[in-house]
Each structure stands twice: as C-alpha cells, then as structure tokens.
Amino acid sequence: MKVAVLGAAGGIGQALALLLKNQLPSGSELSLYDIAPVTPGVAVDLSHIPTAVKIKGFSGEDATPALEGADVVLISAGVARKPGMDRSDLFNVNAGIVKNLVQQIAKTCPKACVGIITNPVNTTVAIAAEVLKKAGVYDKNKLFGVTTLDIIRSNTFVAELKGKLPTEVEVLVIGGHSGVTILPLLSQIPGVSFTEQEAAELTKRIQNAGTEVVEAKAGGGSATLSMGQAAARFGLSLVRALQGEKGVVECAYVEGDGQYARFFSQPLLLGKNGVEERKSIGTLSAFEQHSLDAMLDTLKKDIQLGEDFINK
C-alpha cells in the first residue's frame, strides 16, 4: 500500500507524515512531496523512526515521482489562514495549487483514492472533481474532502461538556467543512442529551473552532497538529478498508445523490474501491433540520465557485 502526502513540508503535512510513518501497516510505502526544497530532508528525518514503513521525499515543481503507484493521495498543500481571514480568502491561492496537483494525479495515478485537506474544502473538492472529469478519470467513490477535524473536535468538546471520556464519544458531522455548513448531529449521540441552548452554543463552537486556533496562535499559523491527527485517522481508515477490512465507517465530503447538494459530508462505509455505501444521516432534531436547510445555499455557492474555476 503506497500513500502519498502532497504538501508534506507544511505544518499539516509534517504532522501527518509523522503519524503515518508510525501507524501505517508494516510494508507500506510513504511518499512525501512538496515544492519546498526541505522535503527530501523531512523524509530522511522520519526515516530514522524504527517502523517498517519505507519513506521517500521529493521536491520541486513535478509531483510525478511521488505519485507513481500511489493507492492513496492526501493533499494538504496550500497557504494557511491568518487572523481576519476566513477559509474563502484562501480560495484565490489554493484553487490553483489543487488544480495543478490533481492534474498530475489524473496523469500518474488516476485510480488512487484522493483526500483533499486543502481549504476551502467545500470548493477545492469540486475543483478536483472537475479536473478529474476533464481528464476522463473521475470516480466519485474515490474523491473525498477530509472533514475528520470537525468530528474529532466535536468528540472532544462533547466529552468536556458532559464529563465523558473523549474516546467514548463519536459524533456524526454532516454538511460541509466551513462555518455554518458544519453540522454536528448532537441529537444522535447515544446516552447524551443537550438543552436547546447547549446544542446551539456547542454547534457554534464546533463551527468556529478553526478560528479559535488561528486567533490563539496570534498570526503564527492555523490548526496544523489537530488537522494532521484528523487526516491521519481518515487516511489510515481508508488504507484499512482498501486492504479488505470490513465495517470501516468515516464521515467525509463526497459526491452523493445530490439530495442536499452535489457534494455533502455524510457517514460512509469504506471498502476496497473507496466508498462502498453512502449511509443515511438518520433523524434530525428540529434545530438540526433548520440548520441543514439554512446552510444549503452557502454550500451550493461554495461548490459552484469550484466548478466555475475549472469550467469558465
């Protein structure tokens, strides 16, 4: 199993690479790529960790050597948020980066499962889909927007609020991956209940958690370490499913049946070919249903922005 990390010299990429070097199954290959010249050195640094995961690093304009034979590609390349920016301010720079890298994936490893971490995910996933479609290699079961950070944040915040162990809590988060499009299904957590005010406040905290980190880092970065952990969790789940493990479920932002929007984050049963089944989001509370209805315009506009970037 070969996993490639694109953007591997950045804050998320290095954290993700460290976790994958430690946790990928024995015999896996890990391939690191970034435009930054430090990247082969990051791979050498990680190669000293005693795990049976082979690692190589590549830098420069051409990602091809890193992508050859990849089964899973995780893209974290791009610029990070600074205070006062929202995820859509990133669009102008990151759209071009994602387009370029996905064009290289389409040529070199078109059958790979691709996880997009680069923000704004609501839009960059649509860009990736359109690029793959133009190249004639798009498979909607193999393209994912990685929204796992919203889930691990939800698990942490719910556990704190309700005095549970974070490992005992698993929150489904649906919709998209920014602001109001992030919708944790708090009403579906077994053995936990919330007042309406608690649900509203907690939902807002989860939606704004990225900004909490950006402000706390005072201009020195955004959520890199927790995002690295979230991306590793998603990537490792995908690898386990591709290797034939049954019953692997993760939420991610994928093209579905278009019931809510063309792309939508929902629970997915993963399998040997990527998405095996898009699972139901279940029964929503009145607050959740209202929040879902209210976000769809925003989500659809985000998606349209990505489609137009490639097709206009």
Curated annotation (Swiss-Prot):
CDD domains from the UniProt entry: MDH_glyoxysomal_mitochondrial
GO terms for biological process, alphabetical: malate metabolic process; tricarboxylic acid cycle
Catalysed transformations (reactions): (S)-malate + NAD(+) = oxaloacetate + NADH + H(+)
A cellular component term, taken from the record's GO annotations: cytoplasm
UniProt keyword annotation of Oxidoreductase present: yes
Transmembrane segments: none
Catalytic residues, chain numbering: 177
Function recorded in the entry: Catalyzes the reversible oxidation of malate to oxaloacetate.
Subunit structure: Homodimer.
Protein name in UniProt: Malate dehydrogenase
Organism, as annotated: Salmonella choleraesuis (strain SC-B67)
Gene: mdh
